[in-house]
Amino acid sequence: MSGLEALYWAQKYPEEVEAIVGLDMAVPDYYDEMNINIPIMRLGQYCAGLGITRWIPSLAESNAIKSGTLSQKEKEIYRAIFYQKTATVTMIDEAKAVKKNAGVVKEKGIPQVPMLLFISDGSGGTGFTKEKWRSIPKEYISNHNNASCIELDCPHYIHDYEYQRISEEIRSFIR
């Protein structure tokens, strides 16, 4: 959803945005096909409110904990935030509105700012095949003369896996 925010901001305030770097960001066309299950989110909210999610520690074992570079203290903080802030009212409201918001961004067209989009292999919870996940952003920027994609062979939360390469590519992009 943050990808939509970046695109919208660049559309609305083009003088404030010099470039967009997308870390496996979802462009508007993803939302045409994305299945957002609000009842499951509400169930998660209910379980979190009762503290049930704490009884299932594997729920908080995200890629950030398994594959990232968090210290032990940071992992504890991450888990505490996860247990307290799972499926909040704001998160559910955002999920309910995201398809409409994607339509607004899509209608305004692609912002004409430089873009560098990192694309995962689509695994890790996107709900798309590798081919489909990668084809949508490529198509999105296909008529943009200052945009490129870099494919990474890792799950959706690419910053947990390819942070070194991402850092190097961003440094090169902004020079």
Predicted feature residues:
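Short aromatic-enriched loop/helix-cap "lid" or pocket-rim segments at secondary-structure transitions
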Residues: 31-37, 128-130, 163
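Flexible "cap/lid" loop of the alpha/beta hydrolase fold
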Residues: 11, 21-50
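Conserved serine/cysteine hydrolase catalytic core
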Residues: 70-145, 149-150
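The alpha/beta-hydrolase serine catalytic core
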Residues: 38-92
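Gly/Ala-rich beta-loop-alpha elbow adjacent to hydrolase catalytic centers
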Residues: 2, 6
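Catalytic active-site module of serine/aspartate enzymes centered on a nucleophile-bearing elbow/loop
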Residues: 142-175
